[in-house]
Regions:
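Conserved MFS/SLC helix-loop-helix module at the cytosolic interface between two early adjacent transmembrane helices
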Residues: 56-94
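Intracellular juxtamembrane helix-capping segments at the cytosolic ends
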Residues: 109-123, 303-320
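Cytoplasmic helix-loop-helix junction between adjacent transmembrane helices
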Residues: 94, 100-135
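Structural signature of the two symmetry-related core transmembrane helices
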Residues: 72-86, 268-283, 357-360
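Helix-loop-helix hairpin linking two adjacent transmembrane segments in secondary transporters
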Residues: 122-126, 130-179
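C-terminal transmembrane helical hairpin of 12-TM major facilitator-type secondary transporters
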Residues: 261-311
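A late C-terminal transmembrane helix in Major Facilitator Superfamily
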Residues: 15, 19, 318-360
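Helix-to-loop junctions at the C-terminal end of transmembrane segments
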Residues: 56-72, 120, 252-266, 347
C-alpha cells in the first residue's frame, strides 16, 4: 500500500507569513501616507525599503538553508518580522517606522526563503505551494475587508506581526538541517554536484526579466489604492472590497493554473499571459469609475498568479535543488521592492494613465526574453497530467510549477526508444518435476 499523502502545514504557514507583506502593500503604503502625513513618494519609498530588505534576505540566505537548518532560520525570520512590524505599528515616529519596516522585511524574506527551499524538496511541492497561496490570499482578503473600517497607520503591519507570532509554534516541526540524504538527493537530482549552477545563461536572462516584470506589476499595485480613491473617486472601504474580490479571483487563477498544468507548455502561458496583464494594467491605471477600476484589478489579479506560477516553474526546472527558483525569486523581489517608488514617481510626474501605458509597453518588451527562455531551455520536462511541481521564492507562486523529480524522463514529443528483442539460448525444461523445493533435504547416503 502507498503511504498516505501528508500536508506540510508548517511550510504552508511559513509561506503565508513570508508572503503576507507584499500582498498587503497597497494598503500599507496608503496607511503610512495618511497616518504619518507622508507624501505619496515618501510612503512608496518606505514600501520599497521593506521589500528591498526582503529581497536581500533571499539573496543572502538562498545557499545557507541546508547548512544552517530550516528551523533555526525560520524562527529567526519570524522573530524579526514580529519585532520589526510590531514596533513599526506601535510608534508614530517616522524613522522608527522605517527601521521597523526594514527589520520586518528582512524577517519576511528569511521566512520566504526557508519555505521556498523546503517546498522545492517536497515530494509534491505543488500541493504545498498551492495551499500556501490559497492561505495568504484568503488572509490578505480578510485584512482588506477589515482594515478600512479601523483607524491607524499600523493595522496592516500589526496583522503581519501577529501572523508571524501565530506561525512560530509550528516551526518545531521543521527539520534542524537539510544535510545528509536530502542534500545528497538534491545534488544528484540535477547532476551538477553541490556547487555549480546549471543553465547559467538562461537563468541570468530569466532573473533579469523577472526583475523588470515584477517592477511593472508592483509599480501599479503600490498605487492602486490611490487610483481608486483619487482618480476613480471611490471610498476606501469600496477600494478594499475591490481588492478582496481581486484576491479571490487570484485564488481561482491559482486553481486554474494547477488544472491547466502542462497542456499549453510554458511559453504560451508566460508570453500570452504577460500580454493580457499589460492590457489589464493600462485599463486599471486609466480607470475613472468603479466599473473600469474593478474590471482592471480583478482581471489582472486573476491572470497574474497564473503567469507567475509558470515563471517560477521555469526557474525551478533549471535546477532540481531549487537554487535558481530562489535566486530568480529574489530578483523578482528586487523588482517588487522598486515598484512602489517607481509607480509613485511616474504617477506624480505624468499621471496614472501615462504611468499605466509606460508599464504596459515595458511588459510587452520583457515578455520576449522570458518567452525565449521558456521555448529554448529544456530543464526538467513538462509532462501531461503531471502533479509534481518544483517551486521557489516569490511569490507567489510556486503553485503551478511543473516538473519531475528526476531528469531521466524524455521530453514531451521526443521519439520513442525502440524495443529490441533479445533472443535466449536453450529450451525450457519440459517437466516441472525437474525442479526440487528450496526446503532442506537429506544428505547423500542419509536415512
Amino acid at each position: 500500500m502507498y503511504a498516505p499523502r501528508t500536508t506540510p502545514w508548517p511550510l504552508v504557514a511559513l509561506f503565508t507569513a513570508g508572503y503576507l507583506a507584499p500582498y498587503l502593500l497597497p494598503t500599507t503604503v496608503g496607511r503610512l501616507e495618511r497616518g504619518l502625513d507622508l507624501s505619496a513618494t515618501q510612503a512608496g519609498a518606505v514600501g520599497s525599503l521593506l521589500l528591498l530588505s526582503s529581497a536581500t534576505a533571499g539573496f543572502l540566505l538562498a545557499s545557507r538553508v541546508e547548512r544552517t537548518g530550516a528551523r533555526t532560520l525560520a524562527r529567526l525570520g519570524l522573530v524579526l518580522a514580529a519585532v520589526g512590524y510590531g514596533g513599526a505599528a506601535l510608534t508614530t515616529t517616522v524613522p522608527a517606522v522605517v527601521a521597523g519596516a526594514v527589520i520586518g522585511g528582512f524577517g519576511s524574506g528569511t521566512a520566504t526563503t526557508v519555505a521556498a527551499t523546503r517546498i522545492a524538496a517536497e515530494k509534491d511541492p505543488h500541493r504545498a505551494s498551492a495551499l500556501g497561496l490559497l492561505s495568504v490570499s484568503a488572509l490578505a482578503g480578510a485584512v482588506y475587508l477589515t482594515v478600512p473600517h479601523l483607524p491607524g497607520h499600523g493595522l496592516t503591519l500589526a496583522a503581519i506581526a501577529l501572523t508571524a507570532l501565530a506561525v512560530w509554534p509550528l516551526t518545531s516541526r521543521l527539520p534542524g538541517g537539510t544535510s545528509g540524504p536530502l542534500a545528497a538527493e538534491a545534488a544528484g537530482a540535477d547532476g551538477t554536484g553541490a556547487s555549480r549552477l546549471p543553465h547559467r545563461r538562461s537563468g541570468m536572462v530569466l532573473a533579469g526579466a523577472m526583475l523588470l516584470w515584477s517592477l511593472a506589476q508592483n509599480a501599479l499595485w503600490g498605487v492602486s489604492g490611490r487610483i481608486g480613491v483619487d482618480q476613480a473617486h471611490l471610498s476606501e472601504p469600496t477600494v478594499g472590497v475591490v481588492f478582496a474580490v481581486a484576491l479571490g479571483a487570484g485564488l481561482l487563477g491559482v486553481l486554474g493554473a494547477g488544472a491547466l498544468g502542462s497542456r499549453l507548455g510554458r511559453a504560451l502561458p508566460i508570453g500570452g499571459g504577460t500580454v493580457v496583464i499589460a492590457g489589464c494594467i493600462a485599463l486599471s491605471a486609466s480607470a475613472t469609475g468603479l466599473g473600469s477600476f474593478a474590471a482592471g484589478e480583478i482581471a489582472w489579479n486573476t491572470v497574474y498568479p497564473v503567469v507567475l506560477s509558470y515563471l517560477i516553474g521555469l526557474a525551478a526546472s533549471l535546477d532540481a535543488r531549487g537554487r535558481w527558483a530562489v535566486l530568480v525569486g529574489s530578483a523578482s523581489s528586487l523588482g517588487t521592492a522598486a515598484g512602489p517608488l517607481t509607480g509613485s514617481v511616474l504617477s506624480a510626474q505624468a499621471g496614472f494613465p501615462v504611468m499605466g501605458a509606460v508599464l504596459a509597453v515595458g511588459l510587452l518588451l520583457v515578455a520576449v526574453p522570458m518567452t525565449g527562455v521558456a521555448l529554448h531551455t529544456g530543464g526538467r520536462p513538462l509532462l501531461p497530467g503531471a502533479v509534481r511541481r518544483r517551486g521557489g521564492h516569490p511569490a507567489a507562486l510556486v503553485a503551478a510549477t511543473t516538473g519531475t523529480p528526476s531528469g531521466a524522463v524524455p521530453e514531451v514529443g521526443a521519439p520513442e526508444q525502440p524495443v529490441v528483442e533479445i533472443p535466449l539460448d536453450g529450451t525450457p525444461e519440459p517437466a516441472r518435476t525437474a525442479y526440487d523445493t528450496a526446503a532442506a533435504t537429506r544428505a547423500p547416503g542419509g536415512r
